[in-house]
């Protein structure tokens, strides 16, 4: 079955699961006959004539999860899903697999966007935040994730050979600069805030200083933000910065971004919102300072229409320390992982995921792949580190673009595991 059919069906599973959990509580593990009328009303409201995997409304979601795990655990059954052609096209191959025929039948109904729009109707749900379908489309088609969803900037950091990792800068920021060393700019993030500035062993004159915003953060907006001087990062003291400069009753400094030509005072109680799209933050100091560190603390979001180049290509760089789980898919795998442990199936599924991943890599590299070059030191559900291995294992025949496609392809399969595996229970 085509990639997009999988995505649309998983979006429908996500919608129905959210609806039932909200209606019946977190203890729900499957459909029973008592759920039929409620679910039938929901499907009627969605104008869905053929609901794919729920053709028989008495089919428990638990059975669906069990079938999916069995399907995914055998690479000759899910082999088409592991091929580049599955990701790149919407063809509909002839399938004979029981799981696909029984539960993921093609939906000749309203498009998934209309399904989502109607499911999110306030008359049906007053506070539902659906979690996975939007980022599936963001990864696959470079569509935008929801702008109301907060983004943790620390998840977006991209280390490169010439630029250290985000948390890896802590030690250097805490180490005094030597005498005669030129001023050094920095831009880091911890949960809920960004910290940027210029460290200097000598006094910096009152002037304008341009601090470059890393490209992986230039796709963000910040709302409900406060801007202030600081000298800490991850609980440690940043050296060679001054935090308590005085200028009487006047501001010590203000910042300005290219997308907003209004001054934003530093150390103010003002609550501000602005975009980092300009790529540069201008810092104007009113008094000499021995370096400065400025924090932006607020709610970060993706800018509208800026996701296209973000996740689907240019931001994924070569290296083992590249975090890839930007949209937090790993936390959605925990429900399934706990069910695997409870059923005693964790090791078996881990072996299946290793085989699946190796087969996917081999499909993208054809005859050039050396399986001995890939060694996963972390379990299957720690996807950021696994993706880092894919981006960094030594094989001169595999270029960065191919590695990016592998990561994106595997991310979508993980999203299906998070959706279809949430009710797994073999007992």
From Swiss-Prot:
GO terms for biological process: fusion of virus membrane with host plasma membrane. It is found in: Virion; Host cytoplasm. GO terms for cellular component: host cell cytoplasm; viral envelope; viral outer capsid. GO terms for molecular function: host cell surface receptor binding; structural molecule activity. Keywords: Capsid protein, Host cytoplasm, Outer capsid protein, Virion. It comes from the Viruses. Belongs to the phytoreovirus outer capsid protein P8 family. Capsid protein which self-assembles to form the outer icosahedral capsid with a T=13 symmetry, about 70 nm in diameter and consisting of 780 molecules capsid proteins. Homotrimer. Homomultimer. This is Outer capsid protein P8. It comes from Wound tumor virus.
């Amino acid at each position: 079955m085509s990639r997009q059919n999988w995505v649309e069906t998983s979006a429908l599973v996500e919608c129905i699961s959210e609806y039932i959990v909200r209606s019946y509580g977190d203890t729900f593990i499957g459909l029973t006959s008592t759920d039929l009328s409620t679910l039938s009303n929901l499907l009627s409201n969605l104008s869905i004539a053929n609901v794919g995997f729920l053709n028989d409304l008495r089919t428990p979601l638990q059975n669906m999860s069990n079938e999916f795990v069995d399907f995914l655990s055998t690479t000759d059954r899910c082999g088409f899903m592991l091929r580049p052609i599955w990701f790149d096209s919407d063809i509909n191959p002839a399938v004979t697999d029981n799981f696909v025929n029984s539960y993921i039948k093609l939906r000749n109904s309203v498009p998934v966007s209309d399904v989502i729009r109607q499911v999110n109707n306030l008359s049906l749900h007053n506070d539902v935040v659906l979690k996975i379908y939007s980022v599936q489309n963001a990864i696959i088609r470079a569509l935008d994730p929801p702008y109301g969803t907060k983004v943790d900037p620390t998840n977006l950091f991209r280390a490169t050979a010439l630029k250290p990792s985000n948390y890896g800068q802590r030690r250097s920021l805490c180490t005094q600069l030597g005498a005669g060393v030129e001023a050094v700019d920095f831009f880091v993030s911890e949960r809920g805030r960004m910290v940027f500035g210029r460290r200097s062993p000598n006094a910096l004159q009152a002037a304008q200083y341009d601090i470059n915003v890393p490209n992986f953060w230039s796709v963000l907006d910040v709302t409900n933000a406060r801007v202030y001087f600081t000298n800490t990062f991850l609980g440690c003291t940043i050296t060679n910065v001054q935090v308590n400069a005085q200028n009487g009753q006047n501001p010590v400094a203000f910042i300005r971004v290219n997308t907003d030509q209004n001054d934003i005072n530093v150390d103010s109680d003002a609550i501000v919102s602005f975009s980092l799209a300009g790529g540069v933050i201008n810092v104007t100091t009113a008094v000499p300072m021995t370096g400065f560190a400025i924090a932006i603390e607020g709610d970060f979001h993706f800018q509208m229409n800026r996701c296209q180049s973000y996740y689907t290509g240019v931001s994924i760089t070569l290296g083992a320390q590249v975090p890839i789980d930007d949209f937090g898919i790993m936390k959605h795998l925990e429900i399934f992982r706990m069910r695997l442990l409870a059923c005693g199936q964790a090791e078996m599924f881990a072996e299946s995921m290793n085989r699946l991943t190796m087969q996917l890599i081999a499909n993208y590299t054809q005859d050039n792949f050396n399986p001995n070059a890939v060694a996963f030191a972390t379990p299957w559900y720690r996807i950021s580190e696994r993706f880092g291995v894919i981006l960094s294992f030594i094989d001169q025949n595999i270029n960065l673009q191919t590695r990016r496609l592998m990561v994106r392809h595997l991310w979508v399969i993980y999203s299906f595991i998070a959706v279809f595996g949430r009710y797994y229970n073999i007992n």
